[in-house]
Amino acid sequence: MSNKTIGLGSIEIANDKPFVLFGGMNVLESRDLAMKIAETYAETTQKLGIPYVFKASFDKANRSSVNSYRGPGMEEGLKIFEEIKSTFNLPLITDVHEIHQCAPVAEVVDIIQLPAFLARQTDLVVAMAKTGAIINVKKPQFLAPHEMRHIITKFNEAGNDEIILCERGSSFGYNNLVVDMLGMDEMKQTGYPVIFDATHALQRPGGRADSAGGRRAQATELARSGMALGLAGLFIEAHPDPDNAKCDGPCALPLHQLEAYLTQMKAVDDLVKSFDAIDTSK
């Protein structure tokens, strides 16, 4: 098996390269907050020498309640993304939910994300593929790791081979997710880069009746475990005031802890990738 390397400017995304951080906030709450969070991530990752891609959503289209905050929408969201990109010279990742969003979003961001709940929607997959952008595929909570090959094939047949696979937990009964560490290793066997969404994997879906709950107190332990697999990247969301975040606050890392958190993740990644491979199948 060979590891595929995806190039994003000077950044190399691959399972055998130093990890790349996809990080930011869950949903754009305001222009000022987005700029503050982007600046904190940019300064921290530059200090630690971690390749970095800024992440936020312009629309959370799958909230538990119709009354929940969704975001500023695509038009306003893309304006904020353009300002972040030009101000901090950062590559960007965001998610799309509808076919008509793919082309305009691809003009601004560098990586388009396929949401887990929509990962089998063929028309959306084809529209995303045709943009030529790098694609981050969230593994659905209801799919086995080996089933990701079918989604890869759809993108390939639509003309796109720039694919990243993202683990975000698997359904475990009602209102609970667990992370299958061997499943992430199984996805690595495809050769495509695998990243670990360590904050969404902390969710308790529907755990607060009209929104998702979470287990923020275990954010470090879960991320350390994932990084021990030797992955292409880590996906996290942070907020300066998680208890008052407009979406997924129970899973968000407190922003003031970002440097300490990433220092540990980089140490684990550096250590694991310094080891020689051991083939225990023989």
Swiss-Prot record:
N-terminal signal peptide: none
Catalysed reactions, as listed in the record: D-arabinose 5-phosphate + phosphoenolpyruvate + H2O = 3-deoxy-alpha-D-manno-2-octulosonate-8-phosphate + phosphate
GO cellular component: cytoplasm
Keywords associated with the record: Cytoplasm, Lipopolysaccharide biosynthesis, Transferase
Superkingdom field: Bacteria
Database matches in Gene3D superfamilies: Aldolase class I
Pathway membership, UniProt: Carbohydrate biosynthesis; 3-deoxy-D-manno-octulosonate biosynthesis; 3-deoxy-D-manno-octulosonate from D-ribulose 5-phosphate: step 2/3; Bacterial outer membrane biogenesis; lipopolysaccharide biosynthesis
EC number: 2.5.1.55
Gene Ontology biological-process annotations: keto-3-deoxy-D-manno-octulosonic acid biosynthetic process
Localization: Cytoplasm
Any one GO molecular-function label of the UniProt entry: 3-deoxy-8-phosphooctulonate synthase activity
PANTHER family for this protein: PHOSPHO-2-DEHYDRO-3-DEOXYHEPTONATE ALDOLASE (PTHR21057)
Family statement drawn from the similarity comment of this UniProt entry: Belongs to the KdsA family.
Identification of the protein by name: 2-dehydro-3-deoxyphosphooctonate aldolase
Gene source species: Shewanella woodyi (strain ATCC 51908 / MS32)
